[in-house]
């Protein structure tokens, strides 16, 4: 089996906290130097590389003299602000040894949820790559809260892969890859060498929390691979402890787990809707509606809705759930949650008589709907 990285021209490489820090005691300058050297080698092969790097909070903790990761959001934000300075400085100096310019880009999910800012970020990144610069990206933890509590750079790496239409996402971690079960508890667990990025069984194999320094466990990596596949990007999850792992992957050596994007690449606008807009609520749909959405490519009509969850407004993104609770699709709703409750299970011809008006005959038009 040949590594998909060998034939990939544009890469997003995500490096976790444990691979750039001294077990939380500040940044590991030597390790960062090795990553810079490997990325420089990829550049020499004609590959474009965007680096998503953790480590800012760990570095900030070291500089502030903290030995434990704080729980308070404002303290995490302070650590991120202090640490981001050091992280950028070390990367800049290490890449300079290879005559490579770097650029620091701090993003939040809100940046990518706004269509204009999304396109601006895309334009900037593509320009930097054209100029031969290595963009170094991290979440802007100093101005957000949800990302610190629940976010992770695995997800950010996938979103960046979508943003720049990367060929592959490389997630480097302190684990060998995805196993069929937790190898610490099950001696029969084996490494999954290759699978479809959208395979449902992968989520069952994954799970568990990450380290005390990082935020992402294996499940976040599987979900990141699924997101990256929306833009046609393959994903490799591999151990950053492997010597020269990036160079070996680029040479064709199969290391870790390869998750292949089997589905057709989404149209750019639908990809943006699927991955960058926050879901504000849910509707439960009947089996007939599931079939029409997944097999017929139809719009979602009110008659197929059997339940409404959460509060949402017209124009927001909602998820469509099967009766079993599995997300089938998501899209931009034409009606609010209050309106949807009134028109659910009714044919479109009755919308006006119930509400006094009819905005659209569909709850979600197929042009604004994405299968997941």
UniProtKB/Swiss-Prot annotation:
SUPFAM superfamilies xrefs: Carbamate kinase-like (SSF53633), PUA domain-like (SSF88697)
Pathway assigned to this chain's UniProt record: Amino-acid biosynthesis; L-proline biosynthesis; L-glutamate 5-semialdehyde from L-glutamate: step 1/2
InterPro entries: AceGlu_kinase-like_sf (IPR036393), Asp/Glu/Uridylate_kinase (IPR001048), G5K_ProB (IPR041739), Glu/AcGlu_kinase (IPR001057), Glu_5kinase (IPR011529), Glu_5kinase/COase_Synthase (IPR005715), Glutamate_5-kinase_CS (IPR019797), PUA (IPR002478)
KW Kinase (keyword) present: yes
Matching CDD domains: AAK_G5K_ProB, PUA_G5K
Amino-acid positions noted as binding substrate in the UniProt annotation, renumbered to this chain: 54, 141, 153
Family, similarity comment: Belongs to the glutamate 5-kinase family.
Protein name: Glutamate 5-kinase
């Amino acid at each position: 089996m040949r590594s998909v990285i060998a034939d990939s021209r544009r890469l997003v490489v995500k490096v976790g906290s444990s691979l750039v820090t001294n077990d939380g005691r500040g940044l590991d300058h030597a390790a960062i130097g090795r990553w810079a050297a490997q990325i420089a080698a990829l550049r020499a092969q004609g590959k474009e590389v965007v680096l998503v790097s953790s480590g800012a909070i760990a570095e900030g903790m070291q500089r502030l003299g903290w030995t434990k990761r704080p729980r308070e959001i404002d303290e995490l934000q302070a650590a991120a602000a202090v640490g981001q300075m050091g992280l950028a400085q070390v990367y800049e100096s290490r890449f300079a040894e290879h005559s490579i310019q770097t650029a620091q880009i701090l993003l939040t999910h809100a940046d990518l949820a706004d269509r204009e800012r999304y396109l601006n970020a895309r334009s900037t990144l593509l320009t930097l790559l054209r100029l031969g610069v290595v963009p170094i990206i991290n979440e802007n933890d100093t101005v957000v809260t949800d990302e610190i509590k629940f976010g992770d750079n695995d997800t950010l790496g996938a979103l960046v892969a979508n943003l720049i239409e990367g060929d592959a996402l490389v997630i480097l971690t302190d684990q060998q890859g995805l196993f069929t079960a937790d190898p610490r508890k099950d001696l029969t667990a084996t490494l999954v060498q290759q699978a479809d990025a959208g395979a449902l069984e992968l989520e069952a194999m994954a799970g568990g929390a990450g380290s005390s320094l990082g935020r992402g466990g294996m499940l976040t990596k599987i979900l990141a691979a699924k997101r990256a596949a929306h833009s046609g990007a393959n994903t490799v999850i591999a151990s950053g402890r492997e010597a020269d792992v990036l160079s070996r992957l680029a040479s064709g050596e199969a290391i870790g787990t390869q998750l292949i994007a089997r589905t057709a690449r989404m149209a750019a606008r639908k990809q943006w809707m699927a991955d960058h807009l926050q879901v504000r609520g849910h509707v439960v749909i009947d089996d007939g509606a599931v079939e029409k959405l997944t097999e017929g490519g139809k719009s979602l009509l009110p008659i197929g809705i059997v339940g409404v969850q959460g509060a949402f407004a017209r124009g927001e993104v909602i998820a469509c759930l099967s009766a079993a609770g599995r997300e089938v699709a998501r899209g931009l709703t034409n009606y609010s949650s209050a309106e949807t409750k009134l028109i659910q299970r009714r044919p479109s011809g009755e919308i006006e008589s119930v509400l006094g008006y009819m905005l659209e005959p569909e709850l979600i038009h197929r042009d604004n709907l994405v299968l997941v």
